[in-house]
Amino acid sequence: MERNNHLLLEIRELPQTEAVAFIRSYHYSKVLPRLIKYYLGFYADEQLLGVVTLGWGTQPLQTIKKIFPKHDLVTASYLEIGKMCFLPSENHNGYFGSLALSTLAKWLRENTGCLFLYTLADGIMGKCGYVYQAANFRYLGCFTTSVYRCMATGEKIHPRSAGQLLKENAALEGVQKKCW
């Protein structure tokens, strides 16, 4: 548990269904990564205030090798923040994001063999991860990538996610194929 002047924060593993429901209620992007190892909830006074997913992107080994090309690290050496979201009351209050990340770092040390915590920090949305930098994450730069934009919602979708989403939407709508 982590304490500041405002909250005593505790992390607990959540059932996938509960974590996904929270994310779909409060995160702007409803798409979740496929490789999720942990669904974690941030609690204060038994109230769920936020959720984070930890796992890996689509190429876990290539990611760690690209970041640390001269080291002999493997996928188990790191975890990636896939989604992190909080109740609206905790956003922009000046401390909750940093408190959550501090609590998460402590949880990782106590519960995993993870050496590094990594995130792309909503780079697809043009963000550079201010909350992560404020919590002493090291900014390693940016890279360009292609994205699709859903015309109905305005959501940006990575091309790797688009194919699966189109298949799922086609099945839901009872049609053979959906296209952008």
Where are these regions (language model features)?
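Short amphipathic alpha-helix that is part of the acyltransferase structural core
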Residues: 1-35
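A short, polar/charged loop/turn motif at coil->beta-strand junctions and beta-hairpin connectors
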Residues: 5, 17, 48, 73-75
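Acyl-donor binding region in acyl/amide transferases
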Residues: 13, 55-180
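Conserved beta-hairpin
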Residues: 23, 36-56
